[in-house]
């Protein structure tokens, strides 16, 4: 990923002004006015870009912060998958808060305005966030694959998840050190270097032309092509297992011998309002587990698909530029500039898309988001608490739901029947 690299100064900018000390004041004032009018001041389409960046900035920061708060303040949401989702949100907050504003200014001015130190830091943090995101998504896919295919071989726990997250944050900064080492800030117009930071670029400097080809080829394979290929295979197997047949551990004999709760109660001489027998309750629990796993798998597949689509343009453009040497001499410079600018925006749009995906595909996250917004915005209902309900209130709610289920046994019977059609092939 290369959001901070600049394609170069725009056409029409003077290529030299001689000795800066000999420039007449009236010429300098005219030249600065020209820079503001024709170079710095955003054009119409750039105002659209600014609005798009601002929207992504707000949605990404607010949405990912709410994701972290929802898991932190609710013990029932502290699952292994949600730990990894929080880690992904932290990486998104990092890249949005630190790197997005710099990328916006670079795309608008086509100049690096932040000096030599940040020229190394900001691209480095962007590369680290990419590595963290890819490794986190890979660990999620691996965890889900083991949970579906080998539930007894590997027991996933919160402690192991936290250890994996620490490992991700230890490995990612280490492997991305070369990105910081090769970044250098230089001026396209050296005669203006002491007077303005305009026309400065933050780009890679390699000792040999072969090195960037090797580095960016490996970067593309390790951070995009290989992990996405492995994750696609894992989710394909998960999809086939969950939607094609019963998950491991489902009791086929229980399904074959299952009788409706009302029939079992009548055989035992009990009324229709009695509690369902253990066998029916076990079957309902398996149906509930199946549905929960399907919902989680569907949400994670969408997250992976959106990540792949958002990072595809910048990954391909970087390979074409760094490995094959394209875009150095081009007649349609504006089209190249537009492609790079849009691909930069897509990278940050992925950070804003994840909380939206959680909202639409996860009922628990949706409840927490609604509770948070109801505290801040009027008209959204009573202000709910982000905390999990107390055990007493949960027990009371469970008792009421049991009474309601007993009083409407026919409805419960219909729910179980529809559940059977979901599980049976």
UniProtKB/Swiss-Prot annotation:
A GO MF term: orexin receptor activity
Region entry Required for response to orexin-A, spans: 26-41
Localization per Swiss-Prot or TrEMBL: Cell membrane
Gene Ontology biological process terms in this record: cellular response to hormone stimulus; feeding behavior; neuropeptide signaling pathway; regulation of cytosolic calcium ion concentration
InterPro entries, per database record: GPCR_Rhodpsn, GPCR_Rhodpsn_7TM, Orexin_rcpt, OX1R
Site (Important for responses to orexin): 36
Disulfide-bonded cysteines: 119-202
Residues in the Extracellular compartment per record: 1-46, 106-119, 183-213, 322-336
Keyword Nuclease attributed: no
Topology feature Cytoplasmic, residues: 68-82, 141-160, 236-298, 361-425
Annotated TM spans: 47-67, 83-105, 120-140, 161-182, 214-235, 299-321, 337-360
Entry-linked PANTHER family: G PROTEIN-COUPLED RECEPTOR 15-LIKE, LEUCOKININ RECEPTOR-RELATED
Role of this protein: Moderately selective excitatory receptor for orexin-A and, with a lower affinity, for orexin-B neuropeptide. Triggers an increase in cytoplasmic Ca(2+) levels in response to orexin-A binding.
Protein name: Orexin/Hypocretin receptor type 1
